[in-house]
Amino acid sequence: MIKFASFLKFRVQINGGRYWSSSPLRSVSNYVKFVFMDNAFKKYSIDTTDYQVGQDNVQKWGFDIHNPVFGISAGLVVFCLISLLLVEPVTARDALNGIKNGIIEQFDAFFMWSTNFFLLFAVGLLFSPLGKIRLGGKEATPDHSTVSWLSMLFAAGMGIGLLFWSVAEPTAYFTDWWGTPLNAEAYSADAKSLAMGATMFHWGVHGWSIYALVALALAFFAFNKGLPLSLRAAFYPIFGDRAWGWLGHVIDILAVLSTLFGLATSLGLGAQQATSGINHVFGLNGGIGTQMVVIAFVTFIAVLSVVRGIDGGVKLLSNVNMIVAFALLIFITFITFDTAMGSLVDTTMAYIQNIIPLSNPHGREDETWMHGWTVFYWAWWVSWSPFVGMFIARVSKGRTVREFLFAVIVIPTLVTLVWMSVFGGIALDQVVNKVGELGANGLTDISLTLFHVYDVLPYSSVISILSIVLILVFFITSSDSGSLVIDSITAGGKIDAPVPQRIFWACIEGSIAAVMLWVGGKEALQALQSGVVATGLPFTFVLLLMCVSLVKGLRTELSAYR
């Protein structure tokens, strides 16, 4: 026994003197605790995990799929579609609208304060020492030029909404279409200022901070820690190897469904809007047939884009998109210079003056407006964050955290400020001065509001055709980038999924939009949209937890930058 005790002392001292004890049993106990705690620490450390990207994948029929995520996602897509199509579209829309509205009404303060927190958290990271950390490692270099990088993140993050809502949203606020911000009197000077300020509030730094934090977490854990480019990887510092199990499966499946149905909804509703524009400009009377042609065209070009990959497809289209968008913006500014410049100054001041009152959910007299617009917007931004965040992450290797946050939050907000000021300012000017359709009847058909504004401008036909082209390109860039994101998630976080897999998801997006439009019309798409917005609630909890995980991860690399 004495020799055995001496042996224990010797072994325990070798593994660390602080575990030595004169009691043999205590020595054994301490040593066992040491071994198991040390192994547990290694198991849950992002620097020592032995998980390999794609280790759970199955290769078959030219696909490289993560078995549970791909199969369950595909099955749930079919189940959701059949369920929506078997039920009367209006009934499905009303039921899902009820769920969405219940979530918005019960969790309004939670959505508002969470979004405020995301903005403050992002600003804190930007100015903290953690901002020096580079995505991909200290010596990493960017994969894309700054211009192409900004073009891709902006095209994926904004899309068609920038065109339609830049005129429709301020007009709606000014004319009391669904309440007015801060209960301002409709058609008053205060209502005009608040209309522009509130529009920018919904499209500015708050929303982009949501995208930025998701993108930053995904990029850091993928490029700095070698983890899969999937949502689950961002939670490894908290959940350890459980992130690779069913907890992670559920997170990724929710991300796939939210992305897929969100894109399909936008594509379907956008096809209706594009068809309305084509009919208005060319004097046609196209209906569901034209909408199917638009969806088929967008899907076909998106397939070509995803086949060519980031550099040959998505980046090229995004650059073309930005060129066309800036050409349109410059031309509109030139022909309405005085109105545009005056609106830019007024909108900037209105945004700065009202950002705090609009961010506060308590004691509001405009609760109906806040629920119908602000809380809906925050839920929508959050529900889209897995898609947009993952795409931004994929193209952001080589940027520092500080550079990344500034570019993703500030630059798009400044571009949006100029865009909204010009287009929204022109629309409100027409309403105030009783010019054109907006001046005579106000907001009647949202899908045609942009073209109603153009009708009273010089070269209206040229501007309208250019806008239709821009609408289609925005559709394509959203579809192809979304397909690449879904490919990555369902491939177990692999960045380059096989070509057949990319084609599969791009076609599925278009097919869902076409089927929903053909069978259920606008009501079916609105039901799908309400379902997507409802996912904003669980994803908000996920994002709050992601902030904790991100800080834990970033702190492991801070010592290399001191």
From Swiss-Prot:
It is a multi-pass membrane protein. It is found in: Cell inner membrane. Keywords: Amino-acid transport, Cell inner membrane, Cell membrane, Membrane, Stress response, Transmembrane, Transmembrane helix, Transport. One of its GO terms (molecular function) is transmembrane transporter activity. One of its GO terms (biological process) is amino acid transport. It comes from the Bacteria. Induction: Induced by NaCl upshock. The keyword Transcription regulation does not apply. The chain crosses the membrane at residues 68-88, 110-130, 147-167, 203-223, 243-263, 287-307, 322-342, 373-393, 404-424, 456-476, 503-523, 531-551. The keyword Cell membrane applies. Pfam families: BCCT. Its main location: membrane. GO terms for cellular component: plasma membrane. Belongs to the BCCT transporter (TC 2.A.15) family. NCBIfam families: bcct. Involved in the uptake of osmoprotectants. Can transport glycine betaine, proline, choline and ectoine. This is Glycine betaine/proline/choline/ectoine transporter VP1456. It comes from Vibrio parahaemolyticus serotype O3:K6 (strain RIMD 2210633).
